[in-house]
Amino acid sequence: MLKPKKTKFHKYHRGKIKGKIYDNVNFGEFALQSLEFGWITSKQIEAIRKVITRYSKKGGKLWIRIFPDKPITFRPAETRMGSGKGNVEYWVAVIKPGKIICEISGIPNSISKYCLKIAGYKLPVKTKILYKN
């Protein structure tokens, strides 16, 4: 799974997600763009990568434009209060509306639309498909 090699701090605050991102299709021909705020885990990013490579028959090129750089911690069940913050369980990428999640090229249009549609079902945020102008 994806995670940073080194971070300044091991544990972070949860934080708030505000604002929008005005992002364009830079690398590929088709892109998957988020329409909502949310967190995408490293497992979900890996699921997107697997789906697109499977349905594209390993042809074309895939760019994943997000990286999980925020640690999410949990406390074990039925533990008493205090004694510090919990352990890091998984890593997430913070997603804002308008963020490009992934891009693909080198695949026929019908197959690339289908790949991105299936990949959008794997995510906890609403998405849409963009085309390069």
Swiss-Prot record:
Gene Ontology CC entries for this record: mitochondrial large ribosomal subunit; plastid
InterPro entries xrefs: Ribosomal_uL16 (IPR047873), Ribosomal_uL16_bact-type (IPR000114), Ribosomal_uL16_CS (IPR020798), Ribosomal_uL16_dom (IPR016180), Ribosomal_uL16_sf (IPR036920)
Q: By its UniProt entry, which Pfam families does this protein fall under?
A: Ribosomal_L16
Q: Where in the cell is it found?
A: Plastid
Q: Which GO terms describe its biological process?
A: mitochondrial translation
Instruction: Please provide the record's keywords in A-Z order.
Output: Plastid, Ribonucleoprotein, Ribosomal protein
One of the entry's Gene Ontology molecular-function terms is: structural constituent of ribosome
Summarize subunit and interaction data from the UniProt record for this chain: Part of the 50S ribosomal subunit.
Q: Which PANTHER family match?
A: 50S/60S RIBOSOMAL PROTEIN L16 (PTHR12220), LARGE RIBOSOMAL SUBUNIT PROTEIN UL16M (PTHR12220:SF13)
Q: What HAMAP family does this protein map onto? A: Ribosomal_uL16 (MF_01342)
Protein family membership? Belongs to the universal ribosomal protein uL16 family.
> What is the name of the protein in this document?
Large ribosomal subunit protein uL16c
Lineage, please? Answer: Eukaryota, Discoba, Euglenozoa, Euglenida, Spirocuta
